[in-house]
Amino acid sequence: RGLGDVYKRQAYAARKFGAPAIVVMPTTTPLLKVNRTKELGAEVVLHGNVYDEACEKAKELAAEHGYTFVHPFDDLEVATGQGSIAMEIVKELPTVDTILVPVGGGGLSTGVSTLAKMLNPKIKVIGVEPAGANCLQESLKAGHPVTLENVNTIADGTAVKTPGETIFPYLQENLDDVITIEDDELIVAFLDILENHKMLVENSGLLTVAALKHLKPEGKKVVSILSGGNMDIITLASVVQNGLIQRSRIFTVSVLLPDVPGQLNKVSKVIADVQGN
C-alpha cells in the first residue's frame, strides 16, 4: 500500500492499544496524509525529502528515546498482514490468472506474491513501480537490494530509494516480473479511473491500472490492486489538468492580434466554430 495508508494504520493501532505514536514522514508528504495521521492521535515529525531519509530519522528517535521502531514494509509480520489481500482475491476469484500489485518498498508485494503462490503456484504476480523510483527492478537485476541515487515521481506513496532487505528474498522467489510506469501514464490512468469508474485513487495506487496497457489481458482474469486514495485537492487539480491536456481536451492558444476593436470577437468565433469553449 501507499505510505499514507501505512502512517494511518500505525497511528490507528497505537491509539487502539492506548500507546503514544510518533510518525516520521518526508517533508514532501501531502498535507492530507499529515492531517489524517494527526487526527488518529499520532505526533507527526516531518524530516527529509524522501521516505528513506524519514525512516533513518525514525530509527534515530527510537534509539535516542527507547521507542519501539516499526518498519512500514521491511517486516515479515507487516507483509503477512498485507498478504491477506491475496487470500481475499483467490477466495472471490479462484480462477485468477494474474495479480498486479503496486511496489514501493516491497511489503505489499511480498505479502501478496508469497500468499498467492502458496494458494496457487500458477498465479502470476507482477509488481508495478514508478519508473522514477524503480528500486526493486534495479535490485532484482543486481541480485541484492540497491539504493537509487534519487527518486522522481508523482507517486509519492511509492517513492522509495531502497527495497526492504529482510523481505527481498521473498520478492526474488515469488514475483514473476516488475513493470515500471512513467508519470504521464499515471496521469492518464487517473483520468480513466475517475471518469469511467467514479473512483478517486492516488497516483501510487494507480500503478496497476496503468500497467494494464503493458500487458495483453484479453481472455485472462487479471486483478489490479488499487491501494490508497490519499490525494489532496491541490494535487488532484494538477493531475486532472495535466490529464486533460494529454487527452487533447484542453489547449493553450497564443495569438498576436492587431490592437483594434473586434479582434477578440473574431478569435472567439473561430473557437466556437470548432465546438470549443
Predicted regions and their residues:
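Active-site-adjacent helical/loop segments in soluble small-molecule enzymes
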Residues: 164-220
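Residues at the starts of beta-strands that form the adenosine-phosphate
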Residues: 20-21, 43, 122-124, 221
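Glycine-rich ThDP/TPP pyrophosphate-binding loop and its adjacent helix/strand module
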Residues: 89-122
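Short, small-residue-biased leader/transition segments that mark boundaries at the very start
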Residues: 2-7
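Catalytic phosphate/nucleotide-handling subdomain of diverse soluble enzymes
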Residues: 213-242
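Alpha-helix C-terminal capping segments
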Residues: 8-20, 111-120, 210-218
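A conserved regulatory-domain signal marking ACT and ACT-like small-molecule sensing domains
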Residues: 236-277
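Small/polar-residue-rich loop-to-helix segments that shape phosphate-bearing ligand pockets
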Residues: 22-98, 129-180, 185-186
